[in-house]
A protein has these predicted regions:
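C-terminal alpha-helical "lid" subdomain
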Residues: 1-21, 63, 109, 189, ...
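A short, basic N-terminal segment
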Residues: 1-47
Length: 285
């Protein structure tokens, strides 16, 4: 967290990295994240199956919210189905049926799975004929059981003539790649072969980190360069590069990690009496 000394040093009345996304203009977008957001939007609108994978704090939820905000802003006739089961490992086909019924109608879910299945198909068909699209969005999808993952294809196959009734968006962490590996889960190959996989990359360069911080400080009416210099951003990028035992260099510069390091650097600058967070301040941490 930012210390009081840092707040005073940089003339801040609130943490630039806490509660920092309240509207679409607060979202930092790269070419990659714009593409991913548009892909989610088009999947929800026109159909398909996609899995969005990214490390914790990489911005998956923010991108999902950005796509949903666009749907609302453009008044698209798209119904969002979001199962609320906390433990996604316990999410079953029956629970997904319940979510579809409750999010797409005013009916109560039927008791038996057979009755629920018929109810789901009827509700989605009638809604589709009324001009609506439907998208099933599941967060923390890396926790889904393989049997549930396998049966998602059955939901995706629901159709009215040539019209697909349900598109599917899964959002999870990189470990989900193992579940989407046909060699490890042969029984789920039907969905694995049909699902598009998108992965979020870190902000590897100092320039990207600078652009990200520009958005955070601009929201508070502050000039980023007076708080974190360009060479400070480059030093942050270097700090957030790691190396495997095999010598492969990779970056962990995801938004959540950048936020934490920027706070530490600002606290350090305040302690050292530095004018701003520059490379020397970053390298002293």
């Amino acid at each position: 967290m930012l210390k009081m000394k840092a707040y005073k040093k940089f003339g801040l009345s609130q943490d630039p990295f806490s509660g920092d996304v309240t509207k679409a203009s607060d979202v930092f977008m790269t070419d990659e994240t714009r593409f991913v957001s548009e892909f989610l939007y088009q999947t929800a609108k026109t159909g398909g199956m996609v899995a969005l994978l990214g490390e914790s704090g990489s911005g998956k939820t923010t991108i999902r919210r950005y796509a949903l905000e666009k749907i609302q802003r453009e008044k698209q006739k798209i119904k969002i189905i979001a199962p609320r089961t906390i433990d996604k490992a316990k999410l079953t086909t029956s629970a997904i049926c319940d979510a579809i019924v409750q999010d797409c109608s005013t009916e109560a879910p039927k008791r038996t799975l057979e009755a629920k299945s018929r109810q789901v198909e009827r509700i989605l068909t009638n809604s589709s004929r009324a001009g609506y699209s439907h998208v099933l969005m599941i967060e923390e999808a890396h926790d889904l059981s393989v049997p549930t993952l396998k049966y998602l294809k059955r939901f995706w196959e629901l159709e009215d003539g040539f019209t697909k009734l349900l598109s599917i968006v899964l959002i999870g962490q990189p470990e989900m790649k193992a579940k989407l590996d046909e060699s490890q889960n042969w029984g789920a190959r039907e969905i694995i072969r049909r699902i598009e996989v998108l992965e979020l990359s870190p902000l590897e360069s100092g320039k990207e980190i600078a652009s990200y911080l520009d958005v955070k400080f601009k929201r508070l009416g502050k000039d980023r360069k007076k708080i974190v210099t360009d060479d400070g951003c480059a030093a942050l990028a270097a700090k957030l590069r790691k190396q495997t035992r095999g010598g492969t260099v990779y970056s962990v510069a995801y938004p959540l990690v950048i936020n934490r390091w920027a706070r530490m650097a600002m606290n350090q600058a305040a302690e050292l009496g530095a004018d701003a967070v520059d490379a020397d301040v970053v390298n002293s941490i």
